[in-house]
Amino acid sequence: MTYEKPDENFNRANFLIRKAAKGGCDTAVLPEMWNTGFLPKSNFEALLDKDCERVKSQIGSLAKELNINIVAGSVANIRNGKRYNTACVFDRSGRLVLEYDKTNLFYPMDEDRYFTAGNSPCTFTLDGIKCSVIICFDIRFDNPVKAASENSSIVFTVSQWPNVRVNQLEALAKAHAEKYGVYYAVCNSCGTAGETVYGGSSLFCGKDGKIIAKAGEAEEILTADILFD
C-alpha cells in the first residue's frame, strides 16, 4: 500500500491477485482502504471512489477474467453525497455480491469526521459457502461481530491495524473464532500512511481459535486451504 497513490495501489493489487490466482487461489482478499491508505488527508475528496465505480470496474472484471472470488478490502467511497468506508465482494462471474459500509468508525483517528457509519448487512455467499465481512475497528464490537459470526462459516476481516497494536487484532480474531466456532481470515495492511506504520501479520484462524497460517509484517501473499463442513 502506497499512501495516497491509488493508481499505484490498483496496479499492485492487480499484480498480486493475478499471482495468487496463478498459484491456485479461489478467493483473494485485500485489506482496508488499500487504494489510498488510512486516512488520506491531502486532496481527500479527489481520492474518493464515487459509488466504488473503479473497484467495481477493475476488480470486478478481474474476478470474472480469473474466475476467482475477490473480497476487495474497502475503499473511501462517496454515495449520494455521503462518504463511507466501503467493502465490496465479487464472485467468480464478476458480480457484486456485497457492498458493506463500516459500522464502527475509528474515532481515535477522527474517522468519524470523514465518514458516515453504515448499517448495512455484512453477510453474503460465495461458492455456496455462507460468509461475512467486517472492517477493522468493527472487530471490537458485538455489532456486527455477532451477526457476522453466527450467520457465516467464515468471517473476512479487512483492516489497517497499526504495528504497535497488531497483537490485539490477532487476539480478537482468535477469541471470536473460538467463541462462535467459525473461521476468521484477517487481511491487514502493511506499509506506512503518514506517521503510522501498519503491522501486516495477516492470518487465518480455525474454528478452535488456533492459527492455521500467519504472514509476517511485510507484504506477502498468504494462503491457506480450508475444508468446510
Residue ranges of each PLM-predicted region?
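Short beta-strand scaffold segments in enzyme catalytic cores
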Residues: 72-73, 86-89, 122, 202-204, ...
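Short, acidic/polar
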Residues: 8-19, 139-146
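Short beta->alpha transition motifs characteristic of CBS
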Residues: 36, 88, 100-106, 203, ...
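Cys-nucleophile CN-hydrolase/nitrilase-fold catalytic domain and related Cys-dependent amidase chemistry
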Residues: 6, 15-92, 99, 163-182
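Active-site catalytic loop in hydrolytic enzyme cores
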Residues: 51, 78-150, 164-171, 227-228
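CN hydrolase (nitrilase-like) catalytic-core segments centered on the catalytic cysteine
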Residues: 51-71, 140-221
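Short polar catalytic/cofactor-binding loops
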Residues: 1-5
